[in-house]
Design a protein with these regions (language model features):
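A structural/positional concept
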Residues: 166-169
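Long helical/loop segments within the catalytic core of UDP-sugar-dependent glycosyltransferases
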Residues: 3-6, 11-44, 61-145, 150, ...
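Short aromatic/hydrophobic "clamp" motif used to bind/position activated sugar donors
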Residues: 50
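Acidic metal-phosphate-binding loop of nucleotide-sugar-dependent transferases
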Residues: 53-59
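Phosphate-coordination loops involved in phosphoryl transfer and adenosine-cofactor binding
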Residues: 47
């Protein structure tokens, strides 16, 4: 059968005690994914990859292939968050010069941090991990706003420090604002 079952998204209505933001949205999405793909369709959590992104995220056409390849080649695929090489270039010529300069500096910095053997990168804005990893670490918290670092640290502590970011060197990103 096909290697990629499909791309899916969820729509989340804020519940009691939930903060507005990506973390509560991610928690909702994981509940939906577990219900639809694990409980109804019988897939194992190891067979499902989650990607967190923003509404203005653009993906390289080969990103999913590269992510899948990186995941299956990883000796510790369930102790990993995958981070793409994020840039802020889609609308770079439509923003004022100062924002353009900051977007270029940030883009170079993010890619450089991923490539550096001396850094310990944290996930930022657009990242992926297996459903199994999310379930083992307790998923995203609904009352947190900075979901990327919080969820990463939650996984890092749950796995006793045996958790890291693996770069996916496919360019993707968001609009510069």
């Amino acid at each position: 059968g096909p290697a990629l079952l499909g791309l899916y998204y969820t729509s989340h209505i804020l519940g009691h005690g939930e903060a507005v933001g990506k973390s509560s949205n991610c928690a909702h999405a994981v509940r939906c994914v577990k219900r639809e793909f694990v409980e109804k369709r019988g897939l194992a959590p190891e067979q499902v990859m989650l990607t967190v992104c923003d509404a203005d995220t653009y993906f390289d056409t080969q990103f999913m292939d590269c992510l899948a390849y990186t995941h299956v080649q990883n000796p510790k695929p369930y102790n990993t968050t995958y981070q793409a090489a994020e840039t802020f270039f889609p609308n770079i010529w439509a923003v004022p010069i100062l924002i353009r300069i900051k977007a270029i500096i940030d883009s170079v910095g993010f890619v450089g941090q991923l490539a550096s053997p001396f850094s310990h990168p944290f996930p930022f804005a657009i990242y992926s991990q297996s459903l199994r990893t999310s379930m083992e670490c307790g998923g995203w918290d609904v009352d947190i706003i900075p979901e990327d670092w919080h969820h990463y640290l939650k996984c890092w502590f749950k796995k006793d420090g045996d958790f890291g970011v693996v770069p996916v060197f496919m360019v993707m990103g968001n609009d510069a604002i």
